[in-house]
Amino acid sequence: MKRSIKHIYLLSDATGETVERVVRAALSQFRDVEARFHRVTRIRSREDVIWALEEVLREPGMVVYTLVDTELAQLLRDEAEAHGLDAIDLISPLLFKLSDFFGEAPQKEPGLLHQINSEYHKRVDAVDFTVKHDDGQDPRGLAKADFILVGVSRSSKTPLSMYLAHKGYKVANVPIVKGIDPPPELYKVDQKRVVGLIIDAERLVQIRTARLRNLGQMPKGSYADYERIEEELEFCRRLYRRNPQWLVIDVTKKSVEESAAEIIQKLAG
């Protein structure tokens, strides 16, 4: 015998994402049940509460709600009871317990959790973008980057990019190789979003030598050769001089955090 579909109304003072996730998690414990969700969001006034319940009464079902305003939550409880509706308050009992536990009243500001979730998803998207645009990958995506870092190999492009990504910025980085022009897409974006990284030659020799040893290789050849590195850096400097709109940062004595702070202050501040 086919079960009838039950209606569940999700009422929220924000987007309703939180209440829906909780209800779906609870429903996963039940087999062979069918539910149709109806979201009613942005409930911020008494009129909104009354209108929401009128919507519920068109095709009655269970009401599950998250309203941080205690007066609106009480109004919804009273009206639901008056109409014989099952209504479950997901957040008020928790707010009361937390208030007692911490000895502090809640802010009662709608949408705070959604704001936190949005910031989290922004960081996730930024990290995903940055990974996909590391070391010159997919130059077509440079236009979507908040910052574009350029510099020679081992000049902190990747760690700096990832640090900024965890701050919520989409970052691409492009390697500068002596004698090879950067991709043309680099010059089609807002040039004030491009950051040129420069580093002292001796410090770069140390970094590249350590890198080779970590890979089990002898520090021979041009990769860690001082004169070769000086030539690479001079090629970089000439490129930066030809593009005066780029922000140039010397990372020799700066930590990743310090370099990131300078970029954010000068380009996003």
Curated annotation (Swiss-Prot):
Record-linked Pfam families: Kinase-PPPase (PF03618)
Enzyme Commission number, as recorded: 2.7.11.32, 2.7.4.27
GO molecular function: ADP binding; ATP binding; phosphotransferase activity, phosphate group as acceptor; protein serine/threonine kinase activity
Catalysed transformations (reactions): N(tele)-phospho-L-histidyl/L-threonyl-[pyruvate, phosphate dikinase] + ADP = N(tele)-phospho-L-histidyl/O-phospho-L-threonyl-[pyruvate, phosphate dikinase] + AMP + H(+); N(tele)-phospho-L-histidyl/O-phospho-L-threonyl-[pyruvate, phosphate dikinase] + phosphate + H(+) = N(tele)-phospho-L-histidyl/L-threonyl-[pyruvate, phosphate dikinase] + diphosphate
Swiss-Prot/TrEMBL keywords: Kinase, Nucleotide-binding, Serine/threonine-protein kinase, Transferase
Keyword Disulfide bond: no
Protein family per UniProt: Belongs to the pyruvate, phosphate/water dikinase regulatory protein family. PDRP subfamily.
General function of this protein: Bifunctional serine/threonine kinase and phosphorylase involved in the regulation of the pyruvate, phosphate dikinase (PPDK) by catalyzing its phosphorylation/dephosphorylation.
Name used for this protein in its record: Putative pyruvate, phosphate dikinase regulatory protein
Source species: Geobacter sulfurreducens (strain ATCC 51573 / DSM 12127 / PCA)
